[in-house]
UniProtKB/Swiss-Prot annotation:
Single biological process term from Gene Ontology: mitochondrial electron transport, ubiquinol to cytochrome c
Localization (cell): Mitochondrion inner membrane
Cofactor note: Binds 2 heme b groups non-covalently.
Membrane-spanning residues: 33-53, 77-98, 113-133, 178-198, 226-246, 288-308, 320-340, 347-367
InterPro entries noted in UniProt: Cyt_b/b6_C, Cyt_b/b6_C_sf, Cyt_b/b6_N, Cytb/b6-like_sf, Cytochrome_b, Cytochrome_b_C_euk/bac, Cytochrome_b_N_euk/bac, Di-haem_cyt_TM
GO CC terms of this entry: mitochondrial inner membrane; respiratory chain complex III
Additional remarks: Heme 1 (or BL or b562) is low-potential and absorbs at about 562 nm, and heme 2 (or BH or b566) is high-potential and absorbs at about 566 nm.
Membrane topology designation: Multi-pass membrane protein
Cofactor list: heme b
Entry protein name: Cytochrome b
């Protein structure tokens, strides 16, 4: 008798995606992050759902409702900090996942890659709107500063900002709509994840060598399910340690002060996972130029497949490209650090240099290095 998982219409889909899926035998731990992101999304949706049961999206009560969750709701503090720090884990996994794709040439699967970039934008939008909900000082001023950037768009900018705000400033209408979108977007993200996996399973997974692995495949279960479970345990241990020992490590103390439109915090900055983009935004003196650079810092990923000049797919056997890749990582760390610093000398010039380097590496140096490597190998 044929196993039910191979005949049942619904179980058949799950089976072909998670059990009998042929996977390359050489996948390293860098391929764990896709499943880790799935776990992060699940944790965020569950904790978010329970938080939404107690949260009120009204400017008069939002801050107090978050305090109420932490003090009066059973394990409310745990839910709140799991959700806040879960977002940080989400972005750590997300950036490592994208980095893996860049290093091993996974971007040559253009449909999967482009849906991935769309997912990145959706998750960033969700995180931004979620940061506004506790209605602390940094929530309010972060929302004001970031939404105000849209006013740089010629002709329609000012009207667009007021349309998003639902008034002439960030107020009750803004908070209510941000809560609505913050609740809705994760489910759109979950749907996009399904499309992402659909495209991935059309082509099959890439592997560290970048060489087609059709003759050497193994079933996903039990080999990679066990490997993924180990990844889950490591990540959940790290998340638990963060939540239970230093839950506010990655947050901003200003967000424990209720939002006050009359009092601006000394340093307005987003959460750590947006600091690299924020540093790029601040490094350009012109408002519209800064906004364009901010958007392009992520959108640049869409043209990476076009700029792939190497005859090899992966960077595994390309030492010159590897050096550039790790330089790019160093530049991103530098930008993240600069984004959290005040706008003064020498941080301004460091930020500008790092921003120029970021675009230079991706647009010019990497393609040139690939061409050089092709010539060195007489290809």
């Amino acid at each position: 008798m044929t196993n039910i998982r191979k005949t049942h219409p619904l179980l058949k889909i799950i089976n072909n995606s998670l059990v009998d899926l042929p996977a390359p035998s050489s996948l390293s731990s860098w391929w764990n992050f896709g499943s880790l992101l799935g776990v992060c999304l699940g944790v965020q949706i569950l904790t978010g759902l329970f938080l939404a049961m107690h949260y009120t999206s009204d400017t008069a009560t939002a801050f107090n409702s978050v305090t109420h969750i932490c003090r009066d709701v059973n394990y409310g503090w745990l839910l709140r900090y799991l959700h806040a720090n879960g977002a940080s884990m989400f972005f750590i996994c997300l950036y490592l996942h994208v980095g893996r794709g860049l290093y091993y040439g996974s971007y040559t699967y253009s449909e999967t890659w482009n849906i991935g970039i769309l997912l990145l934008f959706a998750v960033m939008a969700t995180a931004f709107m979620g940061y506004v909900l506790p209605w602390g000082q940094m929530s309010f001023w972060g929302a004001t500063v970031i939404t105000n950037l849209l006013s740089a768009i010629p002709y329609i900018g000012t009207e667009l900002v007021q349309w998003i705000w639902g008034g002439f400033s960030v107020d009750k209408a803004t908070l209510t709509r941000f809560f609505a979108f913050h609740f809705l977007l994760p489910f759109i993200v979950a749907a996009l994840v399904m499309v992402h996996l659909l495209f991935l399973h059309e082509t099959g997974s890439n592997n560290p060598t970048g060489i087609p692995s059709d003759p050497d495949m193994i079933p996903f279960h039990p080999y990679y399910t066990i490997k993924d479970i180990l990844g889950f345990l490591v990540m959940l241990t790290a998340l638990s340690a963060l939540v239970l020992f230093s839950p506010d490590l990655l947050g901003d103390p200003d967000n424990y002060i209720p939002a006050n439109p009359l009092n601006t915090p000394p340093h307005i900055k987003p959460e750590w996972y947006f600091l690299f983009a924020y540093a790029i935004l601040r490094s350009i003196p012109n408002k519209l130029g800064g906004v364009l650079a901010l958007v392009l810092s992520i959108l640049i990923l869409t043209i990476v497949p076009i700029l792939h000049m190497s005859k090899q797919r992966s960077m595994m056997f390309r030492p010159l490209s590897q050096c550039l890749f790790w330089l790019l990582v160093a530049v991103l760390f530098t930008l993240t650090w600069i984004g959290g610093q005040p706008v003064e000398h020498p941080y301004i010039i460091i930020g500008q240099t790092a921003s120029v380097l970021y675009f230079l590496i991706l647009l010019v140096l990497m393609p040139l290095t690939s061409i050089t490597e092709n010539h060195l190998l007489k290809w």
